[in-house]
Design a protein with these regions (language model features):
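Conserved C-terminal helix/tail region of periplasmic/extracytoplasmic solute-binding proteins
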Residues: 309-339
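Acidic, polar ligand-binding/catalytic clefts
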Residues: 63, 67, 71, 75-141, ...
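Bilobed "Venus flytrap"/periplasmic-binding protein-like clamshell domains
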Residues: 35-44, 54-69, 103, 123-180, ...
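Bacterial N-terminal signal peptides
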Residues: 5-15
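Sec/Tat signal peptide C-region and signal peptidase I cleavage site
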Residues: 17-21
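Extracytoplasmic small-molecule ligand-binding "clamshell" domains
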Residues: 24, 29-99, 275, 279, ...
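Extended ligand-binding regions for polar small-molecule ligands
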Residues: 60-63, 67-69, 131-135, 144-153, ...
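Sec/Tat-exported extracytoplasmic proteins
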Residues: 29-32, 65, 69-73, 94, ...
């Protein structure tokens, strides 16, 4: 009986320990900004204009975290990274978070010293071809076709697997930078270009002289769950990034938007009351205050708003929600309970 009492008392004591700031969060507060690694330029996900202003789905994730942690979505330093640079920058501490259309794989998660914090975009790899080639399906790709692809990516590995499985003997022409790969494709050096379908839509919209002259083939050849990642070794920072992402999803499900975030504090819905910090201080589990999620949503909107503005119906890409819709609308996205 005494042993049981000791176990219960110990469990209660552990549960009562408040979250404390880890080294990454301490560093962020000290320098007054989050250092976010992004793509060198991918419309809809991370792209800078001529004034150096960054926009995109991956960019908004970092802004949401900055709003939650620093009370200012603009306190972010952007570090553009190629596919080959991204993990080194994260591992070395050059950046605090990698939010750069990066696929969550077992080898990356288990052996690179990083933690993926969730899926912000469910994608899949596809092909783009000139309309004049009259290739309407991956099933019609001829043997020995040349394909432009960026090296150091899952895209390159998937292309090799697809070619071998279908006995196509495809000829990859690889480039370190995506800009070089797309330039080679549009100049006619390669017959096809391959990357994630969201990337194909972005590249066709942004870089093609006439987007109508290029078709994205309908079949997917892989699953590509894209999401942010952080260095291992700081559980507090990992939890913050993970739960801000989940919070944006939960906000969409329960109707918390950029426009009504303040007013929703008057809601009597138990879940909304928790999300807004009215009935429960969920921020204490993360080392943040109770209004962390309200600030994030006020800064960039909920997940649905972020999606539609950057890659969906309100963007030039006009991509469908598909798998990125909420679970109760036929998609794969949902958050664990925030409580």
């Amino acid at each position: 009986m005494k042993k049981l009492g000791l176990v219960v008392a110990t469990a209660l004591a552990v549960a009562a320990i408040p979250a404390h700031a880890g080294k990454v969060l301490d560093g962020i507060k000290s320098k007054g900004q989050i250092v976010c690694g992004v793509n060198t330029g991918l419309a809809g996900f991370s792209q800078a204009d001529s004034q150096g202003n960054w926009t995109g789905l991956d960019v908004d994730v970092c802004r949401a975290i900055a709003a939650a942690v620093l009370n200012d979505a603009n306190k972010v330093k952007w570090v553009p990274l190629t596919a080959q640079q991204r993990f080194t920058a994260l591992q070395s501490g050059e950046i605090d978070i990698l939010s750069r259309n990066t696929t969550w794989t077992m080898s990356r998660d288990a052996s690179l010293g990083v933690h993926f914090t969730g899926v912000t975009y469910y994608d899949g790899q596809g092909f783009m071809a000139p309309v004049k080639m009259k290739v309407a399906s991956t099933k019609k790709i001829a043997k020995g076709t040349t394909v432009c692809v960026q090296t150091g990516t899952t895209t390159e590995k998937n292309l090799t697997d697809f070619s071998r499985t279908n006995k196509l003997d495809l000829k990859p022409i690889v480039f370190e930078k995506q800009e070089a790969a797309t330039g080679a494709y549009f100049s006619g050096r390669c017959a096809l270009f391959t990357t994630d379908v969201s990337g194909l839509a972005s590249i066709r919209s942004k870089d093609a002289k006439n987007p109508a002259e290029h078709v994205i083939l309908p079949e997917l050849i892989s699953k590509e769950p894209l999401g942010p990642s952080v260095r291992r070794g700081d559980d507090e920072w990992f939890a913050i990034v993970k739960w801000v992402v989940y919070g944006l999803l939960e906000a969409e499900e329960y109707g918390l938007t950029q426009a009504n975030a303040d007013k929703m504090a008057d809601s009597t819905d138990p879940v909304v009351m928790r999300l807004t910090g009215k009935s429960e201080d969920t921020g204490k589990h993360l080392g943040l205050d109770k209004e962390w999620l309200v600030r994030a949503v006020k800064a960039v909107g909920n997940y649905g708003e972020i999606f539609e503005r950057n890659v969906g119906s309100k963007s030039p890409l006009n991509l469908p929600r598909g798998s990125n819709n909420l679970w109760n609308k036929g998609g794969l996205q949902y958050a664990p309970p925030i409580r």
